[in-house]
Amino acid sequence: MTEISILNDVQKIIVLDYGSQYNQLIARRIREFGVFSELKSHKITAQELREINPIGIVLSGGPNSVYADNAFGIDPEIFELGIPILGICYGMQLITHKLGGKVVPAGQAGNREYGQSTLHLRETSKLFSGTPQEQLVLMSHGDAVTEIPEGFHLVGDSNDCPYAAIENTEKNLYGIQFHPEVRHSVYGNDILQNFAISICGARGDWSMDNFIDMEIAKIRETVGDRKVLLGLSGGVDSSVVGVLLQKAIGDQLTCIFVDHGLLRKDEGDQVMGMLGGKFGLNIIRVDASKRFLDLLADVEDPEKKRKIIGNEFVYVFDDEASKLKGVDFLAQGTLYTDIIESGTETAQTIKSHHNVGGLPEDMQFELIEPLNTLFKDEVRALGIALGMPEEIVWRQPFPGPGLAIRVMGAITEEKLETVRESDAILREEIAKAGLDRDVWQYFTVNTGVRSVGVMGDGRTYDYTIAIRAITSIDGMTADFAQLPWDVLKKISTRIVNEVDHVNRIVYDITSKPPATVEWE
């Protein structure tokens, strides 16, 4: 059985990746309607799409001009498949350009648009059913369509864009110059839902139960009767992977819990108790803290930290695997967001991810990444569907490199202890305030900055701890959480009084973007 045959019974909409910073959100929004969706390379052929058998195709936006020497193209036979196609921004320009219309640099036409604009609908359309004649949308385009291809007609325009929405209903081709996938397009979700349900004919019946069945079948086909190693960190992602793999292959799974000395307070014992005890996973606990901390001594660059941890993690696995027989696979809790942040063919690398860019080329295992098409909120939903308790599913996200990337600069035991203890206080107080479900992620960071303070009658010169708390839906964008002042005050007071070598607390009020969630 191939992956394609496993997916044949699942309706799906494929998003072709042309490099937009928002393209992963298109798939995310479509999934909200109960329709499976994923990104594929713009280089995909019509024949490959026939084999995947999607009910719809979306051409994403992108930063390039259709006239650029390195412009991303499309197999022209895709337009002849008879499958509904929606072109967004660059996608609309590409449809126009390839089918005989005219696209010009927007500056030449005097109609460059960035930011919110008002869309004026001139005709009724299935794509805009149930939305008002005038609506706010997010425009972000350098080129613009000035002549549409034969068979197309105008659906909507804006003050600076003569063709903001076009369609050819006979061929099921649709184009919009704006981005419906972002919240700034007020009726964007309605538009995408109209495309998925009304135009593509989606049933809207895809769920985590479907995903579980699909992944279990894929895992069994991939693994066969061979054995899998999973690195457990104690975080949500690896825990969910562990339970999913256990359900798929049972005792063919061996979990290795590497205690690299960079864990949160009491985390090692909690991992063994929850997953080893309650779920019966076969877990080997390895104390490798000295190996990791020795390698990380005096290392300040965050990318070097990630690479060292990623490499050493695999070497520890090699050591343990050599004691076992017939282990061929390494499972990881890589998410969709991890892959995107590590860069794709069309997108710039933001930072290498510990589950993506830190692995050596001569790694001795094949990789299995069952969650690499899911966003964080979907992983939590998967955990619930697998019968996992909420205390595991809603556990705070924790990066593979652990506290190494929450200690700025060189790592010392003293700095690690300040983060462990301050983070435990933060989590305790957030829970006491009943905010643990409202705040998507929260943790502390040792900034590496020392400052002068006064404690008792004496002068201090100690570390500054930063609190990072964010709200988010899928981890792709985030806002800083507006925690109540009384809660922040209590957290600050407890940390400076209970944690040695800390005399100052600051609160990170930066959204993502421009910042990432983690400081390193």
UniProtKB/Swiss-Prot annotation:
One of its GO terms (molecular function) is GMP synthase activity. Residues 206-395 form the GMPS ATP-PPase domain. GO terms for cellular component: cytosol. Residues 12-205 form the Glutamine amidotransferase type-1 domain. Pathway: Purine metabolism; GMP biosynthesis; GMP from XMP (L-Gln route): step 1/1. Homodimer. This is GMP synthase [glutamine-hydrolyzing]. It comes from Streptococcus pyogenes serotype M12 (strain MGAS2096).
